[in-house]
């Protein structure tokens, strides 16, 4: 098989699993953590060409109040997928744009609802679903699965083959190394 056909086969069976690094909180993120994340953004921007961030999110004079709360964004992805399985990618991208480029807080349901509207979801249904027991159950199941996959961070790429899990090292500057790692997993004999 060629790299592109094998990678295409893998892509067809991809499954997103939300990782949920931080549970619900309305408390402001500690300043030390804000500084650490801002520095992480700078590091990423220096090492991955073309990456952009809007640092206004971390500006104390701005209207944003950073919180360490990723579960709302995870629920938003799940609620979008429940409403339309083909729109999961659009919700993920919308959340990333809101956070990284538009300095909007992805733990705010209003921000997540704006994204839902922008990608064509029924916003009223989305608002009901995001806080529903069904989505909460899905979130718990996904968090459990993320732990079982032994992901070392997020995002992660894990391939399941023959009941074995293979972590793929992410390389944002050279996709060929990831493609080759995927091919190597595909070609592993039982």
Task: Give, region by region, the residue ranges found by the protein language model.
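A short beta-strand-loop structural module common to alpha/beta enzyme folds
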Residues: 12-22
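Non-catalytic, surface beta->alpha helical segment in thiol-disulfide oxidoreductase systems
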Residues: 162-190
């Amino acid at each position: 098989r060629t790299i592109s056909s094998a990678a295409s086969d893998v892509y067809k069976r991809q499954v997103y699993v939300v990782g949920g690094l931080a549970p619900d909180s309305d408390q402001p993120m500690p300043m030390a953590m804000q500084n650490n994340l801002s520095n992480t953004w700078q590091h990423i921007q220096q090492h991955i060409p073309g990456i952009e961030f809007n640092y206004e999110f971390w500006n104390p004079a701005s209207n944003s109040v950073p919180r360490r709360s990723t579960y709302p964004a995870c629920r938003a992805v799940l609620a979008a997928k429940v409403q339309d399985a083909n729109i999961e990618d659009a919700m993920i991208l919308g959340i990333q744009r809101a956070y990284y480029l538009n300095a909007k807080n992805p733990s705010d349901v209003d921000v997540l609802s704006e994204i839902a509207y922008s990608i064509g979801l029924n916003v009223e249904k989305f608002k009901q679903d995001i806080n529903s027991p069904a989505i909460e159950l899905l979130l718990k199941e996904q968090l459990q699965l993320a732990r079982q996959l032994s992901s070392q961070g997020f995002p992660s790429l894990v391939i399941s083959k023959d009941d074995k899990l293979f972590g793929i090292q992410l390389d944002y500057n050279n996709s060929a190394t990831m493609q080759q790692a995927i091919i190597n997993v595909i070609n592993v004999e039982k």
